[in-house]
């Protein structure tokens, strides 16, 4: 299981168990090559090839491993590339649109098989698309939890109305940027279910959130999709 978590494929694990030799360095190199192939697809705006490469990895590895070894490092590498690369905005829109379509389709089909109250994920930043939120939704859905995703922010009053209608098992608010302090406090209060704040916003508002969490036992914090999955697991929120 440790080898699988590090990104070693099932066929490699069988060989390792026979030989007793670790292959972590080899696995690391393999993941770098996989990310490079995806970057080339994104650079060339080649949707079919990008889809083929991702599907090939999806057939070999579970979502949590792909998120940890492939998608999160890829996003970090792309953000560095996009700071100075010509055509960065076209690449960003292309990749984010593909990612939302790809993961959204998987969520849709998974939701048809699940029952119970959904996990409600809401993008509360000003950015039109939050890839980290979609990765979080994918991880939760792959763990057996129905999910609903709101890709744009809602005013606090309308957010409360949405929660009242949907009756989610938990509310997950995602932001990769700073939020107004007053707005943040309004967003985090008043739910009759657990609330998770996820994304870089947790690190940006770290000091302020210490005081808020001390007063709100229903609030959990997670800096990234993997941490969010762990929090959801610890809170026993993933299964119907």
Set out the residue ranges of the language-model regions.
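Long amphipathic alpha-helical segments
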Residues: 1-111
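C-terminal regulatory/effector modules of DNA-binding transcriptional regulators
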Residues: 94-240
């Amino acid at each position: 299981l440790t080898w699988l978590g590090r990104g070693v494929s099932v066929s490699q694990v069988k060989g390792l168990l026979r030989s007793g030799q670790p292959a972590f360095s080899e696995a690391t190199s393999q993941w770098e090559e996989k990310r490079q192939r995806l970057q080339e697809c994104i650079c060339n705006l080649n949707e079919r090839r990008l889809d083929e490469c991702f599907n090939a990895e999806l057939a070999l590895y579970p979502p949590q491993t792909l998120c940890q070894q492939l998608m999160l490092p890829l996003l970090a590498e792309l953000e560095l590339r996009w700071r100075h690369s010509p055509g960065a905005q076209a690449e960003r829109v292309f990749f984010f649109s593909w990612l939302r379509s790809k993961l959204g389709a998987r969520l849709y089909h998974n939701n048809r098989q699940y029952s119970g109250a959904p996990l409600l994920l809401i993008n509360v930043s000003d950015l039109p698309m939050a890839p980290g939120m979609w990765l979080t939704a994918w991880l939760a859905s792959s763990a057996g939890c129905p999910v609903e995703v709101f890709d744009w922010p809602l005013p606090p009053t309308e957010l409360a109305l949405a929660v009242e209608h949907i009756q989610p098992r938990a509310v997950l608010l995602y932001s990769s940027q700073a939020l107004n302090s007053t707005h943040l406090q309004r967003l985090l209060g008043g739910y009759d279910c657990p609330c998770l704040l996820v994304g870089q916003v947790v690190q940006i508002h770290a000091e302020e959130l210490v005081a808020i969490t001390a007063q709100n036992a229903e609030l959990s914090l997670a800096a990234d999709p993997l941490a969010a999955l762990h929090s959801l697991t610890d809170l026993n929120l993933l299964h119907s």
